[in-house]
Amino acid sequence: MSTTRRRRPALIALVIIATCGCLALGWWQWTRFQSTSGTFQNLGYALQWPLFAWFCVYAYRNFVRYEETPPQPPTGGAAAEIPAGLLPERPKPAQQPPDDPVLREYNAYLAELAKDDARKQNRTTA
């Protein structure tokens, strides 16, 4: 693996542009607050935009740090057991009565359809 640091000019330019843009918007909101039509909402935004600029630099710094030394994968420790009684029991299927005439008739109908389908599939063109 290479020991040289990777520089990404496009990413650095993006961080600089985003930071400058956030600081410019903060300055704009500050001047709006100081004007005669300024409100406390403008003051809130004037204080928020520098935080957004700081976050752009912080996120880039963490990105570079994680890229240089990625976090260690978790070690293959023992799998955790689920305590008994934590999960609900699976429902049991309802038992059908063995002598259900409707079910018997339906199954016979399905068997007849399967035979007809098999006959149609086995036809040869001669």
From Swiss-Prot:
Subcellular location: Cell membrane
Keyword list, A-Z: Cell membrane, Lipoprotein, Membrane, Palmitate, Signal, Transmembrane, Transmembrane helix
Lipid-substituted positions (S-diacylglycerol cysteine): C22
One Gene Ontology cellular component: plasma membrane
Segments of this protein annotated with the region Disordered: 70-101
Transmembrane segments annotated in the record for this chain: 40-60
The organism of origin for this protein: Mycobacterium tuberculosis (strain CDC 1551 / Oshkosh)
Lipid moiety-binding residues (N-palmitoyl cysteine): C22
Family annotation (PROSITE patterns): PROKAR_LIPOPROTEIN
Range of residues in the leader sequence: 1-21
Record's bilayer topology term: Lipid-anchor; Single-pass membrane protein
Coiled coil: none
Keyword Transport applies: no
Protein name: Putative lipoprotein LprD
Family that this chain belongs to: To M.leprae ML1177.
